[in-house]
Every structure is written in structure tokens, then in C-alpha cells.
């Protein structure tokens, strides 16, 4: 028997549905596969970008580290070169200063040397003046002489040692024929005075031991420079208004001092009153 057309339509529809069902999971599978592929691609892209970024960052860090290391090495090299140059410059400057000083330093050194040289003779002169030997004495003091010794005796004794220039023998005021007990003998040469000192110090004259000592001549006194003081300015006379008040005061005081206080006028009145009262009582 031949199937009816309605059954044929149903069968065709069922077949179409089955085919559609079969196609739908395939589409779903294909869509899922496509989504997975896209996700994988995205992941791979992100991983690639991240890896590239990582590589870039690592490369940048490596480049920065390299640059920093390079810069540090460069800075260290520059610092070392600077230190080397500074040390070399210092050594060169020290060697130059030690070896050949600059002209300005030479001038200063020459000036200092010239100043020191110029100052030295002045110091030498001062030292010579200070160290100059004191003049040898020519005058001898003779002490502890007895009053019987005279100038002639001293001249006779001390003339044996050299030429005597002067003999000074002070005399007592109250007894002009007697000495004060000492005398000064001045020789012409200092050697003669030294000889007299050696022989007569502790010697005896007129039975008494005497003393002989050198007399140092004082340094000649230099006259002090006179300082001319400026002339004193005469003060102007005081004005007239200052002169007048003391005169007026003197005039006003003088009559007060001269005029005595009169008290005699009261006494006779009292006496009269008393005399009257006494006369009335007697009456």
C-alpha cells in the first residue's frame, strides 16, 4: 500500500528536525571550539604581551642596570680619573712648588730674606751696644784711714804704682787739719789702678789695715729733650653782671655789721617808771 501524503510530510518533517538537531550540536560544538580558540588566542596574546612586556621590562631593567652600571662605572672611572688628575695635579703642584716655586712666592721669599737681613744688623748693633764692655775704672777708693794720714802720704805711697791724676781727700768741718777717714785716688791708666788695687787692698798705712776698691765712672747723662709746652691761654675776664652782685652784697652787709642794736632807750624808761613808783610809795 502507498503511504498517504500526510504521513510523508510528517516523516519529512521528522527527518528535517533530526537533521536540524544533528546540525545544532555541531554548530554548538563549532561555536564552543571557536570560543575556546579565541580564548586560547587571547591567552596566548596576553601571555605573549606579558612575556614581551616582561622581556621588555627585563630588557629595560637590564638596560637600566647596564646603563646604571655603565654610568656607575663611568662615574667611578670619571671619579678615578678626577682623583687621578687631582692627585696628579697635586703631585705636580707639590713637585712644582718643591722644585720650582712660583714667581710671587719667590718675591715674598726674597722680601722676607731681605727684611731678615736688614733686621739682623740692627739687632747686631743693639747686641753690641748691650754687650759693650764696661769702661775699666781708673779711680780707687781708699777707706779706713787714720786721721794722721795726709794727701802727701797717699801721694807718696800710691805714686809707686803709676802716674796719679788727682787725689781727693775730704776734710772734717770742725777739724780742717784732719781727714774724714777716706780718700779717692785717680790714675791716668786703668792698668795702674788695677795694680794699686791688687797690692793695697788689705794693706796697712799708719799701722791700720785699709780697704781699696774700684770706683765705676757713671755714664754721661744725656740731656733730656725739652718739651715745649704750649702757652697757657689767658681766661677772659668775667662779664659785668657777675662782678656787680658781690659788690652790692658787700655794701649791703657793711651797714648791718656796723650798726649796733640800740637797747639803751628802753632802760631809762623803766628806771623812770620805777623811780616814779618808788616816789609814790614814799609819799
Swiss-Prot record:
Establish whether keyword Cytoplasm is in the entry. Answer: yes
- Please provide, in alphabetical order, the Gene Ontology terms of the cellular component aspect for this entry: ASAP complex; cytoplasm; nuclear speck; nucleoplasm
**Low complexity bias spans:** 45-103
Q: Does the keyword Nucleus apply?
A: yes
Tell me where on the tree of life, at the top rank, the source sits. Eukaryota
Q: Where is this region: Disordered?
A: 1-140, 221-283
Q: Which GO terms describe its molecular function?
A: RNA binding
| Span of domain RRM | 161-240
Compositional bias of type Basic residues: which residue ranges?
A: 104-120, 128-140, 244-276
Q: Where is the composition biased (Basic and acidic residues)?
A: 10-36
GO BP annotations, alphabetical order = mRNA splicing, via spliceosome
Gene3D superfamilies annotated for this entry? 3.30.70.330
Q: Where in the cell is it found?
A: Nucleus; Nucleus speckle; Cytoplasm
What is said about its interaction partners and assembly? Component of the active spliceosome.
Q: Which family does it belong to?
A: Belongs to the splicing factor SR family.
In UniProt terms, what function does this protein have? Component of a splicing-dependent multiprotein exon junction complex (EJC) deposited at splice junction on mRNAs. The EJC is a dynamic structure consisting of a few core proteins and several more peripheral nuclear and cytoplasmic associated factors that join the complex only transiently either during EJC assembly or during subsequent mRNA metabolism. Putative component of the spliceosome which enhances the formation of the ATP-dependent A complex of the spliceosome. May participate in mRNA 3'-end cleavage. Also mediates increase of mRNA abundance and translational efficiency.
| Name of this protein | RNA-binding protein with serine-rich domain 1-A
GN (gene name): rnps1-a
Amino acid at each position: 500500500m502507498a503511504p498517504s501524503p500526510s504521513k510523508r510530510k510528517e516523516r519529512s518533517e521528522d527527518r528535517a528536525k533530526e537533521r536540524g538537531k544533528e546540525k545544532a550540536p555541531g554548530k554548538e560544538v563549532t561555536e564552543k571550539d571557536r570560543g575556546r580558540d579565541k580564548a586560547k588566542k587571547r591567552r596566548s596574546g596576553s601571555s605573549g604581551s606579558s612575556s614581551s612586556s616582561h622581556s621588555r621590562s627585563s630588557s629595560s631593567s637590564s638596560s637600566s642596570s647596564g646603563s646604571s652600571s655603565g654610568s656607575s662605572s663611568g662615574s667611578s672611572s670619571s671619579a678615578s680619573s678626577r682623583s687621578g688628575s687631582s692627585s696628579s695635579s697635586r703631585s705636580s703642584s707639590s713637585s712644582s712648588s718643591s722644585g720650582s716655586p712660583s714667581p710671587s712666592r719667590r718675591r715674598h721669599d726674597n722680601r722676607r730674606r731681605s727684611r731678615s737681613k736688614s733686621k739682623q744688623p740692627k739687632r747686631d748693633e743693639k747686641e753690641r751696644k748691650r754687650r759693650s764692655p764696661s769702661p775699666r775704672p781708673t779711680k780707687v777708693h781708699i777707706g779706713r784711714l787714720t786721721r794722721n794720714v795726709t794727701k802727701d802720704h797717699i801721694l807718696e805711697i800710691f805714686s809707686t804704682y803709676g802716674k796719679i791724676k788727682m787725689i781727693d781727700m775730704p776734710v772734717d768741718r770742725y777739724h780742717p787739719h784732719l781727714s774724714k777717714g777716706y780718700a779717692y785716688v785717680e790714675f791716668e791708666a786703668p792698668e795702674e789702678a788695677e795694680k794699686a788695687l791688687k797690692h793695697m787692698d788689705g794693706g796697712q798705712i799708719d799701722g791700720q789695715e785699709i780697704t781699696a776698691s774700684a770706683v765705676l765712672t757713671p755714664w754721661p747723662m744725656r740731656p733730656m729733650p725739652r718739651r715745649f709746652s704750649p702757652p697757657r691761654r689767658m681766661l677772659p675776664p668775667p662779664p659785668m653782671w657777675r662782678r656787680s652782685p658781690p659788690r652790692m652784697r658787700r655794701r649791703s652787709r657793711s651797714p648791718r655789721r656796723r650798726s649796733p642794736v640800740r637797747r639803751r632807750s628802753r632802760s631809762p624808761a623803766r628806771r623812770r617808771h620805777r623811780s616814779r613808783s618808788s616816789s609814790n610809795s614814799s609819799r
